[in-house]
Regions:
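Solvent-exposed, well-ordered loop and adjacent helix/strand elements within mature globular domains
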Residues: 23-159
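Sec/Tat signal peptide C-region and signal peptidase I cleavage site
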Residues: 18-22
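Bacterial N-terminal signal peptides
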Residues: 8-16
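Bacterial N-terminal signal peptides that target proteins for export
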Residues: 1-6
Length: 159
């Protein structure tokens, strides 16, 4: 009986230690991030390799895969096996980028497009019309970004 109790006590200590190590290292930082981004702890997120695309490039049309108009610095092409279409994504590395209208990017993108080369943990960010539109986002090309699903949208993404 004592051996069983000792084994049970040891098991509970090991279990508690494993759960403690799984807890967040920075709960206050996690809370601040969730308030700033609107995402809840445990929201699905992915580390993705980014590429850029623009109108005028081969194979790029004026409409996304939903039939909606592509929106500069908002439309993201994704692999729907990884990230579902109609997902609102927060990409923290894009916060502060210059938008086509001169405003500052808030980090929100709309997963409304797909691409033949977008497979797995890749994301293609639409920058606008012409190769010059890629300049503000050039540093993101081939970079590893963090995309977090923070919601879903209906219809077409806002312009």
């Amino acid at each position: 009986m004592r051996r069983r109790l000792a084994a049970l006590a040891a098991f509970s200590v090991i279990f508690a230690a494993n759960n403690a190590s799984a807890a967040s290292e920075d709960p206050v930082g996690d809370l601040i991030t969730s308030v700033m981004t609107g995402m809840l702890p445990g929201s699905p997120g992915w580390n993705v390799k980014a590429t850029l695309y623009h109108a005028g490039a081969k194979g790029v049309g004026a409409l996304d895969s939903l039939g909606c108009k592509v929106v500069a610095m908002r439309t993201a092409a994704i692999d729907p096996k990884l990230i579902s279409k109609r997902s609102v994504l927060f990409i923290k590395e894009t916060v502060g980028m210059k938008m086509p209208d001169g405003s500052v990017h808030d980090g929100y993108w709309y997963a409304s497009d797909v691409g033949g080369a977008i497979k797995g943990k890749r994301i293609d960010l639409y920058t606008g019309s012409g190769a010059g539109s890629m300049k503000p986002a050039k540093a993101l090309s081939l970079a590893s970004l963090t995309a977090v699903k923070v919601g879903e949208f209906k219809g077409c993404p806002p312009s």
